[in-house]
C-alpha cells in the first residue's frame, strides 16, 4: 500500500487548540503593556470623530466583585467596538476616593481624627489607604483585559480634581442653586453625618410598633366638636408609630382636614374609653388590636379638630392638633404624631403652624440633657425606656412588632434616622433646577428605554439635595458665611478661585489648615469658615466639569454614561443635576444601565449565602475571556445570572469559536496573502458566497455593536461558526483543501476566502474576546500591524452583486437541500447502514425548480453533499424507498456505494483499482498528484 499522505495539503497551525487562557492571558497583557498599546491606539485614532464614554468611578475600597467586572467589561466592549468602527474612543478610568468607608477603615488603623491623631495626619492616612485600594482594583481591571489610560486615571482625590470640585461648587453657588437650611435629613448616627437620598438603601427591619393615647386638656371642648356623642369613658386621640425614639420630640398631632374622624367606645383593659381615629381606619385598627366589641359613638370632620390642645403622653408639653395633607389612611390611625426634628413632612407641617425644632438628639444618636429622663440614652436602645414611660402614664394602647422596609446607610448598612440639622442644599426649586432637569431627560437616549421613566420618577420625588457632610476626609465646602446675616461672602467667586488654586498645590489640607485672615484680612472676624465637606455624590457628580473639561482627550458632553440600574438615583442623577446647575444642559447624550448579578437560583450574591463568585478566581481558572464572553452573551438589561455551571457552558461556546478560528488558520498553511490571493472574480462560487456571508454579517455586527446589543453580537457569531462555517462551508471545502494540488486555483480560492473571513473574524470578536482575538492576530499569515486593536473593520469582504447565477438565493436553496439530505444520511448512519456519508450514493428526487438549481452544480454537487456519487432525478420518479424530507419538493434515497474507497480522498469510485500506476486511487486523485494535470473546480 502506497503512502499518499505527503501529497495531501494537511492543516497545520501554531494556534493551539486549547485556550489555556488562565496561563496565556498574562503574557498577552505584558505584551500589550510593553508595547504601550493604549497609547498606540490613541496615536492611530487621533483626528477621527470622537466617542466619549465617561467612567463612573467605583469606590476605592475593597476588592472588585463580579458586578465591577460586568461594568468594566461592558464599557470595554463599547470602547473597543467604537474604535474598530472608526472612532477615537479614549477611556479614562476613575475612582471615587473620599467619604465614610475609608474614614472607618483608617479609624480602625490609627484611631479617630482629632483625638488619637491630628486631622491633617488622618487625611494623609486616608489618601494613602485610598491609593493602596486603587492599585489592587486596578490590577484586577487590567487583568480583565480592560484597555484604558491606567497610568493616568482620574481620582477624585487628585489635587487638581479636588480643586475643580470646589470650583464646580462655586459655579453652582454663583448660579443661585446653593442654599443653607435647617431641615431633617437622613442622618447616620454611626458616621455622625448627613446622607443624601442616593446614599440610602432600604432593608427589612423589625421595629417596635406602638399605638399611643394623647389625652385632651379640655375633654368637654373636644367632645363638643363631635355630633350626637354617646358612650362613656375618657377621651384620647390615638397615634401609631414605628419609631418610638421620636416620641420625646413629639410636638403636635396631625390630622387630615377632609377625613371623617370617629369617636370609638372600646375597652382596652382600663375600662371603657373613647378613642379618636379616622373613621376609615376603625375596622382595621380594631382588628389589629384583636377587639370585636366596639362601637362608634360620635363623628366629626378633621378640620373641626384643629386647635385642640392635647397633653404629651409622658412629658409636660402642650400638643396642638394641626392639619396636614400628608396624613393618609394607608396605615396607622389617621392621626399622626408629629416631630419636626425627625421627618420631612413633620418639619414642613410644623413650619406652617409655627412649630420649630427642639434638637434633642446629638450627632452620635444619643439624647442630650434637654431630653430629661432619656438623656444619655441612644436612639437605638431607648425602646424599653419609652415603653416604661408610656405604661407609667397609662398612655400605651397597643404594642406589637412590625417587619418593614427601613432606610439604611448604603455604606455602613446601619439604620438611619431623620434629624434636623443646619445643612447646605442644592435647591431644586429656587432657580427652577428640578424643572430644567426633568426637561433635559427628554433629550437623552436611555438604554433600555425604561430608564427614562425611572429617571423621571426619581426626579418627581426629588427633594432639595443635602450636599454637606460633617466628615474629615472630603472636599471642603470652601465658603465664608457672614456671622450676622448668614449670607455668603459677597466676593465668593473670587475666594473660591483663590482656594482652588491653593488646593491644586496642597490638596484639601489647604482649606482645613488655612486661617480666614489669609484670605479675608481684617474682615475675617465678621465671617465664619464652613468646616463641612461635600457629599461624595457631589464629587463624582461633577466629574463632567472636574475631569471631562480638564482632559484634552475628553469632550463635553459625554456620548455615554454606563452604570448599574441603581445609578438612576445615584450618579446619573447627581451628574444631571450638577450639569444643569452649572451649564443648563445634561452631561451625557446616552445613558445605559445594566442589571445586578445573581446566582443560578436568582439570589443576590452575599457572603452569608456562600454564593459569591469571585472574578479573580474565574480569571485564575477559566480566564478573563470567559468572563467577557459571559457578559456579552447575557442580556444585561435584566438581572444577570452567573454560576460555575453557567460559566462552564460559556466555556463550551468559547471552544466553538476558538476551534472554528483554529480550523480556518490551520487551512491557511502555506498561504501567503501577498502572492497567493485569488481575485474575487476568479474565486470558486462557494468561496465567493462565504465571503459575501461574512460581509453581510459584518454589517449586522456593526449595527448590533452600535446599538449595544452584545448578546446579539454573540448569537450571530456563534451562529456563523456553527451553521455557515462548521455546518456547511468548512465541511465542504475539506476535500478541496486537502486533495487538490497545493497551488491550484481550487485550493488558493478557498484559502483566500478563509483569509478574508478570519481577518474579519478576528476584528469581530476583539471587543469581546480581546485576548483570543489578538492571539489569532499574531498567528495570521502576511504582514500586519502589531495588534488587532489598531485596526478597523476589515475592508476585504466583497459582497455578491446580485447578478450572479449562483447568488444568495441559489446558495440558500442548496443549503436547505443539504440540511434536508443530511437528516436522511444521519438516519441511515444511526440505523447502521453506513459509517460515513462518503460511503453513500445519493439520489435526489426534486421538483422542477430544485432540480434546475442543483443541476447547475453538475458533478460538483457530490462535494457539497459530501457523498461519493449524487444523481438528481425528477420528483415523479421517486420510488417507495425514497424518503420524504422537511423540504417541499425533495425526496432522498441513500444506498451504500458498491465501489472501492480511494485511500487518498476516501470517495468510493468505480475506477479505483483499475489504474495500474495507482490502483488505490480514483482518477481525480491521480490528477491531483504533484505531477498530474490538476483538478479543475468552478463551483464547490
From Swiss-Prot:
Its main location: cytoplasm. It catalyses: tRNA(Ile) + L-isoleucine + ATP = L-isoleucyl-tRNA(Ile) + AMP + diphosphate. It is an enzyme of class 6 (ligase). InterPro entries: aa-tRNA-synth_I_CS (IPR001412), aa-tRNA-synth_Ia (IPR002300), Anticodon_Ile_BEm (IPR033708), Ile-tRNA-ligase (IPR002301), Ile-tRNA-ligase_type1 (IPR023585), Ile-tRNA_ligase (IPR050081), M/V/L/I-tRNA-synth_anticd-bd (IPR013155), Rossmann-like_a/b/a_fold (IPR014729). Disulfide bonds: none annotated. GO terms for biological process: isoleucyl-tRNA aminoacylation. ATP binds at residue 607. One of its GO terms (molecular function) is zinc ion binding. Binds 1 zinc ion per subunit. Keywords: Aminoacyl-tRNA synthetase, ATP-binding, Cytoplasm, Ligase, Metal-binding, Nucleotide-binding, Protein biosynthesis, Zinc. L-isoleucyl-5'-AMP binds at residue 563. Pfam families: Anticodon_1, tRNA-synt_1, zf-FPG_IleRS. IleRS has two distinct active sites: one for aminoacylation and one for editing. The misactivated valine is translocated from the active site to the editing site, which sterically excludes the correctly activated isoleucine. The single editing site contains two valyl binding pockets, one specific for each substrate (Val-AMP or Val-tRNA(Ile)). Belongs to the class-I aminoacyl-tRNA synthetase family. IleS type 1 subfamily. This is Isoleucine--tRNA ligase. It comes from Marinomonas sp. (strain MWYL1). The gene is ileS.
Amino acid at each position: 500500500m502506497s503512502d499518499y499522505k505527503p501529497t495531501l495539503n494537511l492543516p497545520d497551525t501554531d494556534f493551539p487548540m486549547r485556550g489555556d487562557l488562565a496561563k496565556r492571558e498574562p503574557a498577552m497583557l505584558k505584551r500589550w503593556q510593553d508595547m504601550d498599546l493604549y497609547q498606540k491606539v490613541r496615536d492611530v485614532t487621533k483626528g477621527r470623530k470622537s466617542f466619549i464614554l465617561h467612567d463612573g468611578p467605583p469606590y476605592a475600597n475593597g476588592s472588585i466583585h463580579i458586578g465591577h467586572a460586568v461594568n468594566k467589561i461592558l464599557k470595554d466592549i463599547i470602547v473597543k467596538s467604537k474604535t474598530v468602527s472608526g472612532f477615537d474612543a479614549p477611556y479614562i478610568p476613575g475612582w471615587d476616593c473620599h467619604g465614610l468607608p475609608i474614614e472607618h477603615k483608617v479609624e480602625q488603623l490609627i484611631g479617630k481624627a482629632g483625638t488619637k491623631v491630628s486631622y491633617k495626619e488622618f487625611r494623609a492616612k486616608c489618601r494613602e489607604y485610598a491609593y493602596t485600594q486603587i492599585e489592587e482594583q486596578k490590577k484586577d481591571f487590567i487583568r480583565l483585559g480592560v484597555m484604558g489610560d491606567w497610568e493616568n486615571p482620574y481620582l477624585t482625590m487628585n489635587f487638581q480634581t479636588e480643586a475643580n470640585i470646589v470650583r464646580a461648587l462655586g459655579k453652582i453657588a454663583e448660579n443661585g442653586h446653593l442654599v443653607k437650611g435647617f431641615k431633617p435629613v437622613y442622618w447616620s448616627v454611626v458616621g455622625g453625618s448627613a446622607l443624601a437620598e442616593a446614599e440610602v438603601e432600604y432593608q427589612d427591619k423589625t421595629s417596635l410598633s406602638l399605638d399611643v393615647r394623647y389625652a385632651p386638656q379640655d375633654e368637654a371642648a373636644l367632645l363638643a366638636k363631635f355630633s350626637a356623642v354617646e358612650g362613656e369613658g375618657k377621651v384620647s386621640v390615638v397615634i401609631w408609630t414605628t419609631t418610638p425614639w421620636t416620641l420625646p420630640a413629639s410636638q403636635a398631632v396631625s390630622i387630615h382636614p377632609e377625613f371623617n374622624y370617629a369617636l370609638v367606645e372600646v375597652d382596652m383593659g382600663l375600662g371603657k374609653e373613647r378613642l379618636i381615629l379616622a373613621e376609615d381606619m376603625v375596622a382595621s385598627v380594631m382588628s389589629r388590636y384583636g377587639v370585636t366589641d366596639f362601637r362608634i359613638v360620635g363623628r366629626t370632620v378633621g378640620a373641626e379638630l384643629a386647635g385642640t390642645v392635647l397633653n404629651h403622653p409622658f412629658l409636660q408639653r402642650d400638643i396642638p392638633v394641626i392639619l396636614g395633607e400628608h396624613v393618609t389612611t394607608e396605615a396607622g390611625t389617621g392621626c399622626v404624631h408629629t416631630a419636626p426634628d425627625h421627618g420631612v413632612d413633620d418639619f414642613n407641617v410644623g413650619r406652617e403652624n409655627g412649630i420649630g425644632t427642639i434638637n434633642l438628639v446629638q450627632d452620635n444618636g444619643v439624647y442630650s440633657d434637654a431630653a430629661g429622663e432619656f438623656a444619655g440614652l441612644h436612639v437605638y436602645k431607648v425602646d424599653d425606656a419609652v415603653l416604661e414611660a408610656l405604661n407609667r402614664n397609662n398612655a400605651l394602647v397597643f404594642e406589637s412588632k412590625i417587619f418593614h422596609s427601613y432606610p439604611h446607610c448604603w455604606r455602613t448598612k446601619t439604620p438611619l434616622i431623620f434629624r434636623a440639622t443646619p445643612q447646605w442644599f442644592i435647591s431644586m426649586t429656587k432657580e427652577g433646577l428640578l424643572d430644567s432637569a426633568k426637561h433635559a431627560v427628554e433629550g437623552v437616549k436611555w438604554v433600555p428605554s425604561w430608564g427614562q421613566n425611572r429617571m423621571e420618577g426619581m426626579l418627581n420625588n426629588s427633594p432639595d439635595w443635602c450636599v454637606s457632610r460633617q466628615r474629615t476626609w472630603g472636599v471642603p465646602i470652601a465658603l465664608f458665611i457672614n456671622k450676622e446675616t448668614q449670607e455668603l461672602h459677597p466676593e465668593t467667586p473670587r475666594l473660591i478661585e483663590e482656594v482652588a488654586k491653593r488646593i491644586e498645590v496642597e490638596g484639601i489640607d489647604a482649606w482645613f489648615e488655612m486661617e480666614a485672615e489669609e484670605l479675608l484680612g481684617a474682615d475675617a472676624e465678621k465671617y465664619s469658615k464652613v468646616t463641612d465637606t461635600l457629599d461624595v455624590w457631589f464629587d463624582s457628580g461633577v466629574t463632567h466639569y472636574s475631569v471631562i473639561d480638564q482632559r484634552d482627550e475628553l469632550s463635553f458632553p459625554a456620548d455615554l454614561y454606563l452604570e448599574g440600574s441603581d445609578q438612576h438615583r445615584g450618579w446619573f442623577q447627581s451628574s444631571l443635576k450638577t450639569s444643569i446647575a452649572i451649564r443648563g444642559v445634561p452631561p451625557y447624550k446616552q445613558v445605559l444601565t445594566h442589571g445586578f448579578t445573581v446566582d443560578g437560583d436568582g439570589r443576590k450574591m452575599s457572603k452569608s449565602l456562600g454564593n459569591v463568585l469571585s472574578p479573580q478566581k474565574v480569571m485564575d481558572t477559566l480566564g478573563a475571556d470567559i468572563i467577557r464572553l459571559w457578559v456579552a452573551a447575557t442580556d444585561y438589561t435584566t438581572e444577570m445570572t452567573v454560576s460555575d455551571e453557567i460559566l462552564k457552558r460559556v466555556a463550551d461556546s468559547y471552544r466553538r469559536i476558538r476551534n472554528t478560528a483554529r480550523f480556518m488558520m490551520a487551512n491557511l498553511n502555506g498561504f501567503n496573502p501577498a502572492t497567493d490571493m485569488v481575485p474575487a472574480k476568479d474565486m470558486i462560487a462557494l468561496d465567493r458566497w462565504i465571503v459575501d456571508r461574512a460581509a453581510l454579517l459584518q454589517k449586522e455586527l456593526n449595527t448590533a455593536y452600535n446599538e449595544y446589543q452584545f448578546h446579539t453580537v454573540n448569537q450571530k457569531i456563534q451562529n456563523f461558526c456553527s451553521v455557515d462555517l462548521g455546518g456547511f462551508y468548512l465541511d465542504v471545502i475539506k476535500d478541496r483543501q486537502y486533495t487538490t494540488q497545493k497551488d491550484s486555483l481550487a485550493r488558493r480560492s478557498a484559502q483566500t476566502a478563509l483569509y478574508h473571513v478570519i481577518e474579519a473574524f478576528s476584528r469581530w470578536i476583539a471587543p469581546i474576546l480581546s485576548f483570543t482575538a489578538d492571539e489569532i492576530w499574531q498567528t495570521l499569515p502576511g504582514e500586519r500591524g502589531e495588534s488587532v486593536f489598531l485596526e478597523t473593520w476589515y475592508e476585504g469582504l466583497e459582497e455578491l452583486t446580485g447578478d450572479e447565477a449562483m447568488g444568495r438565493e441559489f446558495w440558500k436553496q442548496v443549503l436547505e437541500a443539504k440540511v434536508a439530505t443530511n437528516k436522511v444520511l444521519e438516519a441511515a448512519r444511526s440505523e447502521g447502514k453506513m459509517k460515513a456519508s462518503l460511503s453513500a450514493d445519493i439520489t435526489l428526487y426534486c421538483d422542477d425548480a430544485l432540480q434546475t438549481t442543483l443541476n447547475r452544480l453538475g458533478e460538483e454537487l457530490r462535494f457539497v453533499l459530501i457523498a461519493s456519487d449524487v444523481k438528481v432525478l425528477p420528483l415523479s420518479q421517486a420510488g417507495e424507498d425514497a424518503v420524504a424530507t422537511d423540504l417541499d419538493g425533495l425526496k432522498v434515497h441513500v444506498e451504500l456505494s458498491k465501489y472501492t474507497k480511494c485511500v487518498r480522498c476516501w470517495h468510493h469510485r468505480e475506477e479505483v483499482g483499475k489504474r495500474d500506476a495507482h490502483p488505490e486511487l480514483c482518477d481525480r486523485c491521480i490528477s491531483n498528484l504533484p505531477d498530474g494535470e490538476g483538478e479543475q473546480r468552478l463551483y464547490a
